């Protein structure tokens, strides 16, 4: 059983230093026409400021977050954006969470950023590669820069760009406690997850352990997403892979061993035996039967909101 080599694209900008806000993904979603297409001009024409009710830089930020959180993607023709299937299920009128009120919606956005690392290299690095439990931004900048350089294909990266990206990432989970700006004081979408806290000024620590707002169904959804991303074709995974592997639910959700094990114990009942936990002769593994992963994902995502 081997972990598929990571192929993370180096992407450290686009958000204009604005952390993801609560209703921004919904705002982007609402721009779609009846055929699920969003014109690129929606984010760049003269009416964009009035359409979104924010400044031009924030409009650019909303577009970035909608792409990074996989609300929309660029069409193959690169002429327009098209809504993602999961986004349609979540944000549509009558959908699972049209007003972005459920924690699962924030967990899904976090998974896209820190689990998949799409347009969010620093997010993936912070939750998967960084081993420090407590840190300051200055302390971890050199290791981020080294990681960024290793995946950039020789492209020179600005230290200032990396520093802004890291600050935006951290503030998205642990916002500044004092701010003169109303927008800055608004609660970032991911802060409610309780993954990161500012212990004292400039010193941050991960909150590792059980996550009460993370549903078992969404954990199962994320597990299979991770499985098919890095272990496609394998019929079993070790406990260590699920708890500690790069891009794994254990790392991305900052679960401790006990919390991860508790989630795995209940998978057989939750999934009607499609996923089964085994602890035989000290070998802890999770097994999967032969099932339609896409259909399974749709069922688990729906149950995440029930």
Language-model segments: which ranges?
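Donor-sugar nucleotide-binding helix/loop cap in glycosyltransferases
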Residues: 2-306
């Amino acid at each position: 059983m081997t972990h598929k080599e990571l192929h993370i694209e180096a992407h450290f900008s686009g958000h204009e230093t604005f952390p993801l806000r609560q209703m921004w993904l919904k705002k982007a979603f609402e721009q779609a026409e009846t055929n699920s297409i969003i014109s690129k001009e929606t984010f760049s024409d003269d009416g964009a400021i009035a359409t979104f009710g924010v400044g031009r830089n924030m409009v650019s930020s909303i577009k970035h977050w909608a792409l990074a959180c996989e609300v929309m993607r660029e069409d193959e023709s690169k002429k327009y954006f098209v809504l993602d299937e999961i986004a349609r299920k979540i944000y549509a009128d009558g959908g699972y969470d049209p007003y972005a009120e459920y924690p699962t919606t924030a967990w899904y956005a976090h998974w896209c950023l820190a689990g998949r690392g799409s347009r969010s290299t620093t997010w993936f690095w912070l939750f998967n590669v960084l081993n420090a439990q407590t840190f300051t931004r200055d302390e971890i900048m050199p290791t981020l820069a080294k990681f960024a350089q290793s995946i950039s294909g020789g492209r020179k990266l600005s230290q200032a760009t990396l520093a802004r990206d890291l600050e935006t990432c951290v503030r998205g989970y642990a916002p500044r406690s004092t701010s003169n700006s109303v927008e800055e004081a608004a609660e970032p979408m991911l802060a409610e997850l309780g993954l990161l806290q500012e212990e004292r000024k400039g010193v941050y620590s991960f909150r590792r352990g059980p996550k009460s707002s993370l549903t078992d169904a969404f954990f199962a959804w994320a597990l299979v997403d991770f499985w098919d991303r890095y272990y496609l074709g394998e019929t079993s995974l070790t406990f260590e892979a699920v708890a500690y592997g790069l891009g794994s639910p254990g790392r991305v959700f900052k679960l401790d061993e006990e919390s991860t094990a508790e989630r795995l114990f209940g998978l057989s009942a939750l999934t009607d035996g499609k996923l089964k936990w085994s602890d035989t002769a000290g070998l802890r593994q999770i097994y999967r039967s032969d099932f339609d992963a896409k259909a399974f994902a749709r069922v688990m995502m729906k149950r995440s909101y029930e």
